[in-house]
């Protein structure tokens, strides 16, 4: 069961061994793990997997762990704030790798405050608040039922904030 599930936390904490060694040892628990895919993803993300985590920046550790996670070929991939700590080119590469990874047999669950960085990858949106589930809808349903941008005074705003050009926010599409 757990060999079909992989979690990538926001902050990566790893043993102080070369990342390639970590990937080899931990990859053994995932039947779909591919060392060649790991190497390819490390190359795409410009990561030197021979380094130990303490010699890597936060963003480098995250990229290495994401390369490992994708190489495990798990059916369910949970990503917590996957773009935090990544530079712009790495975010672009991450989106490309996730798009290639996604298929009908796999589920990718992304927890993020930076929706714009992954919006092209999203099929369904779940929004949680203090009370629990605030919204669950497909992107298509949201596009049909909501409008985003400048709001008129008559608009029934779901969310609104002041900007230099007036009120910006989300309203029910009428």
Model-based region annotation:
Residues 3, 7-64:
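ABC-family P-loop ATPase nucleotide-binding domains
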Residues 77-81:
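Catalytic Walker B motif of ABC-type/P-loop ATPase nucleotide-binding domains
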Residues 91-104:
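Helical segment within the ABC ATPase nucleotide-binding domain
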Residues 106-114:
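Conserved H-loop
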Residues 118-120:
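A short, surface-exposed alpha-helical micro-motif characterized by mixed small hydrophobic
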Residues 136-137:
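ABC ATPase "signature
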């Amino acid at each position: 069961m757990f060999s079909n599930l992989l979690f990538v936390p926001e902050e990566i904490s790893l043993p102080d061994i070369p990342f390639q060694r970590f990937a080899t040892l931990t990859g053994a628990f995932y039947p779909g793990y591919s060392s060649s895919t790991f190497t390819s993803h490390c190359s795409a993300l410009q990561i030197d997997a021979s380094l130990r985590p303490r010699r890597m920046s936060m963003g480098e550790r995250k990229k290495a762990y994401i390369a490992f996670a994708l190489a495990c070929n798990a059916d369910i991939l949970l990503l917590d704030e996957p773009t935090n700590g990544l530079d712009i080119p790495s975010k672009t590469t991450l989106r490309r790798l996730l798009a290639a990874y996604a298929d009908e047999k796999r589920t990718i669950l992304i927890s993020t405050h930076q929706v714009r960085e992954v919006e092209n990858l999203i099929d369904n949106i779940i929004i949680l608040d203090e009370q629990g589930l605030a919204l669950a809808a497909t992107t298509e349903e949201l596009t049909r039922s909501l409008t985003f941008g400048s709001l008129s005074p008559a608009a029934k705003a779901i969310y609104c904030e002041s900007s230099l050009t007036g009120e910006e926010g989300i309203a029910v599409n009428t």
